[in-house]
């Protein structure tokens, strides 16, 4: 996780730069009100930099204004704030991965299979990919863009796709398994591809397929995002057909580099490539 990687990177930076880095981590518990209160407490305690995985990406202005009033840089990550909010202050930043890229790479994984093993993928031979979609939490930017771009990638390549069903499984393996179980009962072998916004939901789909007695040869073509260890194991086993690596290590390293440079030097590190003076973009890998 990003939290674990941040703790690791902080220790490495302490040793490399002979300085003390204190990390204070709080859980907003999906409540923007609670998160705003936590930011207030951090500012009152005089922390040097605040990093925020914002609950509601449209509500960043409040936090940016609080940070500016206190003169404390704020780094958003994971959920990208609205651009206008980020530009309210020169020391508000975003570190993350373009969410649409993960969807594009998922689409390309399916396209590769369509080109190389079409007879296997196109079960009913109609020249159309029948798919189901397991989405993350409703309204989450990553979920919306991954969902949009995986399908637009197919369309841009001239491949027709038909959505049989979709459901918001909130990134959860258990919820995804329940949805997939229902779809298997309803659509059976007509499901050719399962797009999952993350690996946990992809694994939930695999769980449901296994419960239904399907082996890896008879399961749909299932793809996820994150390249988690359990997903990589499923990839080796052949039940998961593809995943996209979400660079938690690179995210943590970039956040820490930016936070330390802002704290020590008052400006972003020259080692970081800033886009529009606000954004540090990382990349997904399939």
Which ranges hold each PLM region?
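Flexible loop/hinge segments that line or gate small-molecule binding clefts
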Residues: 63-101, 117-128, 228-236, 240
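Short, solvent-exposed amphipathic alpha-helices that sit
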Residues: 2-16, 102-107, 141-160, 175, ...
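Hydrophobic alpha-helical segments within soluble ligand-binding/sensing domains
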Residues: 35, 94-126, 176-179, 227-231, ...
């Amino acid at each position: 996780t990003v939290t674990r990687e941040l703790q690791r990177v902080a220790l490495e930076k302490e040793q490399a730069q002979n300085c003390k880095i204190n990390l204070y981590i709080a859980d907003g518990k999906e409540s923007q009100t609670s998160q705003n209160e936590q930011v207030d407490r951090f500012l009152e305690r005089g922390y040097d930099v605040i990093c925020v995985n914002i609950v509601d990406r449209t509500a960043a202005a409040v936090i940016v204004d609080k940070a500016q009033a206190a003169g404390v840089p704020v780094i958003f990550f994971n959920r990208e704030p609205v651009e206008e909010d980020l530009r309210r202050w020169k020391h508000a930043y975003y570190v993350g991965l373009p969410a649409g890229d993960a969807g594009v790479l998922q689409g390309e994984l399916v396209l590769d299979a369509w080109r190389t093993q079409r007879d296997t993928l196109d079960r009913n031979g109609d020249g159309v990919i029948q798919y189901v979609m397991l989405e993350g939490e409703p309204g989450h930017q990553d979920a919306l863009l991954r969902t949009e771009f995986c399908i637009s990638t197919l369309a841009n390549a001239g491949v027709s796709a038909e959505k049989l069903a979709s459901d918001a499984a909130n990134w959860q393996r258990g919820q995804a398994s329940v949805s997939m179980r229902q779809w298997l009962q309803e659509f059976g072998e007509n499901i050719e591809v399962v797009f999952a916004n993350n690996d946990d939901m992809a694994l939930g789909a695999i769980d449901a397929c296994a419960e239904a007695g399907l082996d890896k040869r008879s399961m749909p073509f299932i793809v996820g995002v994150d390249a988690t260890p359990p997903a990589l194991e499923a990839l080796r086993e052949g039940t998961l057909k593809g995943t996209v690596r979400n660079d938690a290590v690179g995210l943590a390293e970039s956040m820490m580099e930016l936070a330390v440079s802002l704290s020590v030097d008052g400006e972003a590190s020259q080692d970081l490539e800033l886009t529009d003076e606000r954004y540090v973009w990382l990349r997904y890998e399939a």
